[in-house]
Amino acid sequence: FIVLISATAHFIFRRREPTAFQYACFQAGLALLLSVLLREPFGAVVLILLALNFLLGVQIALYRLFWHDLRVFPGPRLAAITQGWILREAYLGRSRFSMKEVGETYGDWVRIGPNELCTTSIEALSTIMGPKGWPKGPSYDSGITKGDSGGDSVLTIKNLPEHATRRRIWNKAFTPNAINGYLPSIEIRLEEMLSVIDTEIKKGESVDLCLQLGCFVYDTMCDMAFGALAGSAFSKTQEDKYRILTHMGRVVRQVGIVRNMPWLTPIVKAWPSSHRREQNEFKEFTKSMFLRRKNQGLGKQLDVFHYLLGEDTETGTRLTEAELAADSTLLVITGADTTRTVLLAFFLYLLKHPNYMEQLQAELLAAPDLSPPSLSRLEYLNACLQETMRLQPPSPANLQRICPPGGAVICGRQIPEGTKVRFSNYAIHRDERYFSRAEEFRPQRWLQKAKDDLGNQGEEKERLDQRAFFGFLIGPGACVAKNLAWMEMRLVVATILTNFDLSFAPGFDPVAFESSWTDAYLLLIEEPFEVMFTPKSQRMR
């Protein structure tokens, strides 16, 4: 009887995977049915249910190993049986390493879950992530901006026409004219950061770049997203600002774990946690920022929120309050932490390679000025930033799509419908097929001379497949604020390197610092980055 029930349940569930709620209802209904039919005491019913679930688990494991459509794809044996393999890697903060390791071990296509594949094929990337690519997978159901409001952010929308409408609204906030309007705020916050650095220099102390860049991106994010001095209304000191960023990291880490099993989301939200207070404080912060700016209305304040309050010119659609709240959370997270991550990695790599820093400083000092148009034309500056994003993409293992009805043939491989496919830009960016000496920081690979020499025979044949670089993601889901991020990063780098010489603080361990970075949806850098700043004799401030 138990075997029959478990076999029937498996036959049903493998065709339509239940949600956590549906499975709980199934268990409760079955318990009630057993108690009525068998007239057994409660303890006996519990034992029967345990036996049934054990048999069901064995049947599922055997099916996934030997009869599942994805059995032909290699991968870790545990990953074929349970999503717990990738969940464990996410919990340990090493998903980016895992995706790279399995690609090197098993090849282009690897099974990383019972119904999920990972690929490092750039041909598959362009097909699946392109303009006519596949819809987003279930990992977006536990998206970072799917909060208590119930609304979808532009990041978590799965419906492609709806996403296109939302992107048109967002695009207005990042036109060249709109971006130029954010420049005064960036310049003011840069001056504030330089003043703090000068104070630390006078004390003879090192500067924690993790703290200073964190406060800088917090202030600029608040100014550009919600209006001038918006962040100061809630966080007046550096400690307050950095605390918000730390709390944000806790939220990001939680989402980075549960997105591998989205049905865990309501359970995790309800589960008591030592970080619950921090997560709630971050939610209150984003809610307060949203409500404060919403109540101000359109007005003359041309911040990002001004454009989000407008309508789509093609359809006349306006965002609902729940959608605005979700997009506000997205603004806070992607507007701050991703920029800080790239800048921290950038300065770490330059400090580890002083010859590259000297070459970049020479280019900056020779520039006619440090305006955004002038900086955008500096080839070596752009090369160093690109190389940083190649080695340390701020969102390193998070692109998931789902195969549409009818299945598909990609690169000669039959992909069944409903199969999730994941891309890791960290793994692809470090693939020797696409980049020579892929593990090394070599900004010269991006210079025009190196590109012109591609394919030339010599001591070493340079490989640079630009299709394999997607630091700002790719396709319809690519970063809408890419040009703003470029401008902000160039200005920060140029301002610091034309005013100071940098060196590691005494006792600072760059290897241990880099080893402390974890990926949980985004790349998280939380340890202090102690750097000695020496003012240049002629500063360009």
UniProtKB/Swiss-Prot annotation:
The keyword Mitochondrion does not apply. Its EC number is 1.14.-.-. GO terms for molecular function: heme binding; iron ion binding; monooxygenase activity; oxidoreductase activity, acting on paired donors, with incorporation or reduction of molecular oxygen. It is an enzyme of class 1 (oxidoreductase). SUPFAM superfamilies: Cytochrome P450. PANTHER family: CYTOCHROME P450 (PTHR24305), P450, PUTATIVE (EUROFUNG)-RELATED (PTHR24305:SF187). This is Cytochrome P450 67. It comes from Uromyces fabae (Rust fungus).
